[in-house]
């Protein structure tokens, strides 16, 4: 299955074969290009650098947060009468996005350390710190919430009689 299967499961892509690989490559490339643009912008001197670094944690958090909300909506819709597989797919999407949000916040924190070294100042001080803290809190909160709800659901599932 390999790397493409893992990345595909993160993106929740239903395509198969060559189309799946092309879509995964495209999404990953776009993400790397966007991240690269922000890092390069951050290394430029003056006001541009401060703007880039002030916005970086918020931009990093947009994709995983949107992804989490999509998974949350899908999971809520599956709560009624959908299959176990559908519930698990939605759950997986939310867990991946929660971890993604936490990782992005960590990357933004590393970016702020680089900004301190390069510019001898914290760029966008309050804005940047707020963005990083919000992402770390949201990511960790999502992971804790998801684990707690999952355990409750499994316990409820064990109480039901098995189908023959």
What are these regions (language model features)?
Residues 1-21, 82-87:
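Cytosolic juxtamembrane N-terminal segments of multi-pass membrane proteins
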Residues 62-82, 143-150:
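Membrane-water interface of transmembrane alpha-helices
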Residues 25-44, 60-63, 100-112:
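Canonical alpha-helical transmembrane segments of integral membrane proteins
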Residues 41-52, 117-124:
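Helix-coil boundary and interhelical linker segments in multi-pass alpha-helical membrane proteins
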């Amino acid at each position: 299955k390999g790397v493409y299967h893992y990345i595909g499961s993160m993106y929740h892509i239903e395509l198969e074969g060559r189309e799946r690989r092309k879509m995964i490559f495209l999404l990953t490339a776009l993400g790397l290009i966007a991240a690269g643009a922000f890092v390069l912008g951050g290394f430029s001197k003056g006001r541009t650098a401060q703007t880039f670094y002030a916005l970086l944690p918020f931009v990093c958090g947009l994709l995983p947060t949107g992804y989490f909300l999509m998974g949350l909506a899908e999971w809520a819709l599956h709560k009624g009468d959908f299959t176990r597989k559908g519930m698990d797919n939605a759950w997986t999407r939310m867990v991946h996005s929660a971890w993604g949000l936490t990782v992005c916040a960590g990357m933004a924190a590393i970016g702020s350390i680089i900004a301190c070294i390069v510019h001898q100042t914290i760029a966008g001080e309050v804005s940047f710190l707020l963005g990083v803290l919000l992402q770390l809190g949201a990511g960790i909160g999502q992971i804790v919430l998801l684990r707690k709800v999952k355990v409750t659901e499994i316990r409820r599932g064990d109480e039901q009689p098995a189908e023959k």
